[in-house]
Amino acid sequence: MASYEVLADESYSELLSILEWFSHFSLIPTLIGGWAVFVYNSYFGSVDVDLVGRSMSGNFLDTIERYERSHGYEEVRSAGLGIEVAHRKPIYRENKFFGYVEVDVCTFEADVGSFHEDSSKKLPYKLCDDPHLVRKVNFNGKSFAHVPKKPLLFLYKLKAFRDRKYDLKTRGAIMGVKRREWMRTKVEKDGADLIALLNPEPEQYVVREKFDFQLLKQLVENHDLSFALGSVKELPDRKKVLERHVGIKQKTVEQWVNTFFEKLAR
């Protein structure tokens, strides 16, 4: 198996284990990022596990930190959510080192949710505290998570896409080579995740959910996010993003993007 496949496989196992751990304390975290996209379109998976939730007077972070201390994780500075807690676990198979699975955790209270290009524009994780904007997902009968409904998750991924592109544009010249390449790879994955959420007929999924354009329109209006939607038009022209969707043609993605804006305008 390729390194990414090994890491994604291990990451998914860790995700299920972490969610089961939370269930022992009667807690259900909210899953965002690549594994949240996997719920709606299981095309790729993720290396990172991204979780958010209420602080609950420190219980949320304490729960995940206890898990990580007892499961071979080491604390690192997060390059993902950029918040309180990030830990990574080295992955070996047959004595070969493949890389790390990273777990990034953020509380609703700590997250500001500002766009990097304009701090006055915000899309906070606290929106996931609204039961009308998330759904409870059962992964295997023992592992549960809340996942943002497809329109909200789409906006979170769109924000990540724009934030990382902005960081590359404004700070890429002073980044180290590895950091810059990591950021470019993340931008590609964000773009691929956006396409995955636009796909009206995914081949595989955990939960089938129709894209609610009325909810998307409401979120965009409530948070003044129309400026960000232009990035969706870029997706069909990003070759490396399209390469992550084997068998899907550029014209198909163009049709999905056109349909997206047509339905949003109704």
Model feature map: region roles:
Residues 1-266:
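Compositionally biased terminal segments of proteins
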